[in-house]
Amino acid sequence: MDFSSYFPIWNKLTPTQQQILERNAVLRKVDKGTVIHNGTVECTGLLLVRSGQLRAYILSDEGREISLYRLFDRDICLFSASCMMNSIQFEITIEAQKDTTMWVISADTYQHIMKESAVVANFTNEIMATRFSEVMWLMEQIMWKSFDKRLAEFLLEECSLEETNILKITHETIASHMGTAREVVTRMLRYFQNEGMVKLARGTVEICEERRLQELSDT
């Protein structure tokens, strides 16, 4: 499938705008673990995911990561083109969680179309509002929800995404997603194991009591 099949508002663009986007959209393939954009890069461009999975995260002064959101097929990343938004200074890192194919559109190209199209401008604002809502929700979870509940919710989300109850994931990776230390994750996972909710092995977490994790997450 080509670019036009993935861009959500393609049919609302003028033929000229469609030609500009198609001509300037560069298809790029990256391996799992590749850092596509980080806060020190001036402007990577707008990203449109064709297949795979991307993770957006921030780094603390101590180098600790915390995931903000993830991007899947047909999702668009604007923060990698933050130079389009003069009032937003957001040092964010975008990393491939899986082998990913995506289109990269230069900020200049997209900004040109956004300035002449109210449809594109409104669409962009909707994406921005959604991302900020996700970040605000995450901050509320970190501030007000206990870690055991957050971890239960994370494990259930991973099971849903990977479509399996046996997660191939390390404690270090979980810690990076959740913005905490590996030791904290390990202690809580061992508690979950003692309670019969999970089974731990090297590099894997098996969900044994999905219902109990859901109840814990919901309380």
Regions found by a protein language model. Give the residues of each.
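Cyclic nucleotide-binding regulatory module and flanking cytosolic helices
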Residues: 1-31, 71, 76, 81-85
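Polybasic "coupling" helices that flank or enter modular domains
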Residues: 97-99, 115-180
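Cyclic-nucleotide recognition modules
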Residues: 69-125
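Phosphate-/nucleic-acid-contacting segments
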Residues: 147, 156-219
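Glycine- and acidic-residue-biased ligand/ion/polar-headgroup-sensing regions
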Residues: 33, 44-57, 72-74
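Short phosphate-coordinating micro-motif centered on Lys-Gly-acidic
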Residues: 36-41
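Short alpha-helix-to-loop micro-motif enriched in aromatics/charged/Gly
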Residues: 61-68
